[in-house]
Amino acid sequence: MAVTPISLRPGVLAEAVVDLGAIDYNVRVLREHAGMAQLMVVLKADAYGHGATQVALAALAAGAAELGVATVDEALALRADGISAPVLAWLHPPGIDFGPALLADVQIAVSSVRQLDELLDAVRRTGRTATVTVKADTGLNRNGVVTDQYPAMLTALQRAVVEDAVRLRGLMSHLVYADQPDNPSNDVQGKRFAALLAQAHEQGLRFEVAHLSNSSATMSRPDLAYDLVRPGIAVYGLSPVPSRGDMGLIPAMTVKCAVAMVKSIRAGEGVSYGHDWIAQHDTNLALLPVGYADGVFRSLGGRLDVLINGKRRPGVGRICMDQFVVDLGPGPIDVAEGDEAILFGPGARGEPTAQDWADLLGTIHYEVVTSLRGRITRTYREAQTVDR
């Protein structure tokens, strides 16, 4: 991969730099895996912490056909920022007013007859036809219409189509074990999904598109691609199957801050609250001005490394709300105040990765990149040619 050095912007305490060139590259990789299927790029949770509007623009330019979000509010935010591409929202609280979504040409996925009724109420109030996808539960047991309620959903949709209240767009579901491509549950869900499509056809309903595959299935189960695939985490360059390595993707996010202070301490002195870490010899320290209020997990205290001037430096002592400390080692000081410290990034320069953090935390890299907040400013590198 061609690496362009990243430097801190003046006056910025800490940055999450999103490389739009990596987004472009990853979308093109996913398009290759998708074959004849179109791409719906998933932008929920502010594009997994990467910034929904900028990622949407980059993904659409790279060939994504549609966008997907969890909530209507997320879809409306894209519309407010001028994004006109098809966008689907699929997670709705009871009593939601779908009117603003219809007026903004947002497609709606419904998981129950009650949700469909609420949507049809908005159709009557606004005079707008709703573009509807049915979200079916094929085994995940989250949102999605359950099997025994599916016939009632189809009957209600038939009436709505006849009344021109609904344009029937799609059938979607979500896999339980997509990160385990060979798990037999994927085949079971695939068969259930195919049966639901057939059941709708028998009842005279034709979905324009069907989609089941998330990132991992897009890259490892071409037999489940159908008409559309819904990659999420892979768009951001994070492997949907970590046991298979990076899968040819480039992580888009680099988190960094400036060294706020450098100081020397004597052997026997402690660092941070409780002095959990005691210097075994004279050493030098660097203070980094980010903490658990910014998404640097407190449980990483004394466990994470950062990259400063080409070297991995271990964190020492407890991570505080606003700051933490790394050990520079004894002898001549090779770090100055204002130098760049990389908390995690693609790993190309030896820095830790989001997956490294996830491994330390016993979690997944999704949680790492979506937890950044507080005083970490998100900035962007414009899309450019990325070689790998």
From Swiss-Prot:
<dbReference type="Pfam" id="PF01168">
    <property type="entry name" value="Ala_racemase_N"/>
</dbReference>
<dbReference type="InterPro" id="IPR000821">
    <property type="entry name" value="Ala_racemase"/>
</dbReference>
<comment type="similarity">
    <text>Belongs to the alanine racemase family.</text>
</comment>
<protein>
    <recommendedName>
        <fullName>Alanine racemase</fullName>
        <ecNumber>5.1.1.1</ecNumber>
    </recommendedName>
</protein>
<dbReference type="Pfam" id="PF00842">
    <property type="entry name" value="Ala_racemase_C"/>
</dbReference>
<feature type="active site" description="Proton acceptor; specific for D-alanine">
    <location>
        <position position="44"/>
    </location>
</feature>
<feature type="binding site">
    <location>
        <position position="321"/>
    </location>
    <ligand>
        <name>substrate</name>
    </ligand>
</feature>
<comment type="function">
    <text>Catalyzes the interconversion of L-alanine and D-alanine. May also act on other amino acids.</text>
</comment>
<dbReference type="GO" id="GO:0009252">
    <property type="term" value="P:peptidoglycan biosynthetic process"/>
</dbReference>
<feature type="binding site">
    <location>
        <position position="142"/>
    </location>
    <ligand>
        <name>substrate</name>
    </ligand>
</feature>
<feature type="active site" description="Proton acceptor; specific for L-alanine">
    <location>
        <position position="273"/>
    </location>
</feature>
<dbReference type="GO" id="GO:0008784">
    <property type="term" value="F:alanine racemase activity"/>
</dbReference>
<dbReference type="GO" id="GO:0030632">
    <property type="term" value="P:D-alanine biosynthetic process"/>
</dbReference>
<feature type="modified residue" description="N6-(pyridoxal phosphate)lysine">
    <location>
        <position position="44"/>
    </location>
</feature>
<dbReference type="InterPro" id="IPR029066">
    <property type="entry name" value="PLP-binding_barrel"/>
</dbReference>
<dbReference type="GO" id="GO:0005829">
    <property type="term" value="C:cytosol"/>
</dbReference>
<dbReference type="InterPro" id="IPR001608">
    <property type="entry name" value="Ala_racemase_N"/>
</dbReference>
<dbReference type="GO" id="GO:0030170">
    <property type="term" value="F:pyridoxal phosphate binding"/>
</dbReference>
<keyword id="KW-0663">Pyridoxal phosphate</keyword>
<comment type="pathway">
    <text>Amino-acid biosynthesis; D-alanine biosynthesis; D-alanine from L-alanine: step 1/1.</text>
</comment>
<keyword id="KW-0413">Isomerase</keyword>
<dbReference type="InterPro" id="IPR020622">
    <property type="entry name" value="Ala_racemase_pyridoxalP-BS"/>
</dbReference>
<dbReference type="InterPro" id="IPR011079">
    <property type="entry name" value="Ala_racemase_C"/>
</dbReference>
<dbReference type="InterPro" id="IPR009006">
    <property type="entry name" value="Ala_racemase/Decarboxylase_C"/>
</dbReference>
